[in-house]
Amino acid sequence: MISPSDLGPGSPVQSCFVEDVEPWLVERISEDPTILGRGDLVLKRASWRSRRVSLLLENPAEMALYVLELQLGPTDDRHIIRLVERWDATRKRHWRKRCFAVLVAEQIAPRYLNILQLISRAVPVALREIRVSEAAGTVTLAAVRVGSLLR
């Protein structure tokens, strides 16, 4: 479990802190996967630890899989590498389905956009920044499109 101080100053999740943030994020996405902007998806697998959440989502109608890596706080190079590695392993394991990578963080630094654009020549990537807000005692989650590098 992380504490608000682990998230860094100014973190949206810190200001609307929920106990056990990672399971809460998985539950919100599972309840309403459309917040990711990829349509109505089914959660196939989830794991989390240390401010990171890994999800595998499926769109059965389109025979498509979405490998999602979510990181609390700003994205970093390890986040990007982990996403590409998981996407590649999933693509090889489920070779009959289309496979997409989705990078989600509280903040995607502009310095990574050029790298992600280069990666997108081989890997279909979607980028989302999560926004957490609180109104009338209810904490909500939204994923804002930063850019889509999907072909």
Regions found by a protein language model. Give the residues of each.
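Charged, terminal alpha-helix-loop-beta segments
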Residues: M1-R151
